[in-house]
Amino acid sequence: FLDLISGGRLEFGIGSGAYQREFDRMHPGLKQSDGWKYMQEMLPLVRALWQGDVAHDGQFWQFPSATSCPKPVQPEVPVWVAARSPITFDYALREKCHVMSWPLTRGFSEAELYKQQLDAAVAKADNGFRPNFAMMRHAAVYENAAGRDAAIAAIQCVLGQFENLFRNLGDVKNGFPKQVPLDELQGREQYNAAMLEENLLFGSPETVIKKLQKYQSLGVDEFIYYASLGLGMEAQKQSLQLFCDEVIPAFQ
């Protein structure tokens, strides 16, 4: 339906999932580390359902004859797969999918690793498909120390909630995850303020442009501005406005 009302502009994204809490509720007993198996069986079925009636009796999914109605306008809807490990890069290229990667809070070397895995998967698939490569990073553009401090405080709070969901460490009340204190987490050095400012797309417009140019040189085709970092609405609007007004023109 979305492809229909958008005039054939749907791009479909799929991933293996991340939060053990979600797996516990959707499929009790399913380990987070096994989510990719379900995703890999699912994607060909989604594509088949877009074409017409299909029934399936597989290892992970079973259903009688069904289809998608209305059908997509596009003969082939572009598909994006979220990938961070070689097995998922290989799968994405076998299925002729574009790839989106997210280095979490890690440094640029993590993005370089993903590009190496992508190139290896392209060579391994050897099917003539050249994917678009997107990189997602938390982003905050600011002009002074107060803006920097607000962005760092916000992302540290959100990361504490992320760890709660990812590792199933705390409770969720009325839809809001409890923040796990970062100083209690193993590997907490990855949430150091200076490291976050360096690794994420944080900084003045000039700094963010320089950071993005590194991704462009690496071979990243598209950048996803990850705005979900807990900033207040006004601060978030200011950041996005700076990005639109002063960062985007550098890449046009």
Question: Where are these predicted regions, by residue range?
Answer:
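Active-site-proximal loop/turn and secondary-structure-junction residues that shape catalytic pockets
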Residues: 16-20, 85, 105, 139-141, ...
